[in-house]
Amino acid sequence: MNIALIAHDKKKSDMIQFAIAYRDILADHTLYATGTTGLRVKEATGLPIHRFQSGPLGGDQQIGALIADNAMDLVLFFRDPLTAQPHEPDVSALIRLCDVYTIPLATNMGTAEILVRNLNKGTFDFRDVAKNGGTNETT
């Protein structure tokens, strides 16, 4: 599965801790991330990560494009709800795209843990259904 990792500045340490804790699960998937988040997670875990621009410089939109193309399966976006973000319209657009295209979205470590543990158990069949036009055939 394709997984996006995004974290606002005050949540980057949470994302790094999460990626270290779930490194073995994340290693089985293709990872994408916005600029600094991807760099810091890669440095901490050694995981290969396709890095886009920083969020405010278009990285959120680049990940959004993958969502719109049905090429993203899960988004882990650790948001800082207490700090105003200069690129808030991009953040809102990304969240809206997750809703439009039925992409699971975790905005905090607790939800991310539930999603990643279930991903590891193989309970994300609905993504195969979405990719196969409403059938559960994986051929």
From Swiss-Prot:
It catalyses: dihydroxyacetone phosphate = methylglyoxal + phosphate. It is an enzyme of class 4 (lyase). The active site is at 60 (proton donor/acceptor). Pfam families: MGS. One of its GO terms (biological process) is methylglyoxal biosynthetic process. InterPro entries: Methylgl_synth, Methylglyoxal_synth_AS, MGS-like_dom, MGS-like_dom_sf. Residues 1-139 form the MGS-like domain. Belongs to the methylglyoxal synthase family. Catalyzes the formation of methylglyoxal from dihydroxyacetone phosphate. This is Methylglyoxal synthase.
